[in-house]
């Protein structure tokens, strides 16, 4: 078992009238993020019953890859664009991988 991967769950509450705009801006960021070195996955998920509840699942090879992501232009653009679309500040949880083994991602 390896604990090298960093998995980040970001919980976002989006204003009801801004969901489509938020998802469009987030897809631009997600597409660019998936091309970054050290990024294993970047998923955008929406609650089935609450369309304003969005969860980002970000998987990085290590802390350095996650830190590098925060310095990219597309991340800065996303942050600026979506800040007024959020009903509350986003919440993130940093997790370590237990199973499956990192090599299986």
Language-model segments: which ranges?
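Glycine-rich beta-strand-turn "strand-cap" elements at beta-sheet edges
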Residues: 1-6, 44-52, 80-105
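N-terminal first-folded block
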Residues: 3-44
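Short, well-ordered beta-strand segments in beta-rich or mixed alpha/beta enzyme
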Residues: 6-13, 43-70
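Short alpha-helical
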Residues: 17, 28, 49-51, 73, ...
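Intrinsically disordered, low-complexity acidic/polar segments
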Residues: 19-21, 53, 65, 101
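An amphipathic, aromatic/His-enriched active-site/gating alpha helix that lines ligand/cofactor pockets
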Residues: 28-40, 59-93
């Amino acid at each position: 078992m390896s604990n090298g991967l960093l998995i980040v769950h970001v919980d976002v509450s989006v204003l009801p009238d801004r969901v489509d705009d938020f998802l469009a801006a987030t897809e631009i960021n997600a597409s660019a993020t998936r091309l970054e070195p050290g990024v294993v996955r970047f998923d955008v998920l929406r609650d089935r019953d609450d369309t304003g509840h969005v969860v980002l699942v970000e998987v990085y090879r290590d802390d350095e890859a996650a830190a590098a992501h925060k310095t990219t232009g597309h991340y800065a653009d996303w942050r600026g664009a979506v800040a007024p679309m959020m009903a509350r500040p986003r919440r993130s949880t940093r997790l370590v991988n237990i199973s499956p083994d990192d090599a299986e991602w």
